[in-house]
Amino acid sequence: MESYRRVKGYEFEFVDQGPDDRFYQCRGDVYYDDEHDEIPEPGLWEAALQLEQQLKDEGYVADANHSEKGWVEVCLL
């Protein structure tokens, strides 16, 4: 697995915390929706979805999601 992947100008770092906890992560700016909930930076979210598809095309089971403080993750399931 590559240590880093660049997608749409965003650099995703690979984190391996064991066989059940492997993912790519990247942090962007924090945005808020109309209900004042944190959401990921729009361009970064698009990049995460693109990375998810790239990993699926390579045969991995992948899922893009986001957490707080601008972080997005693409988990390998």
Predicted regions: what they are:
Residues 1-21:
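Short, extreme N-terminal segment that most often corresponds to the first beta-strand
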Residues 15-72:
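Acidic, low-complexity, intrinsically disordered interaction modules
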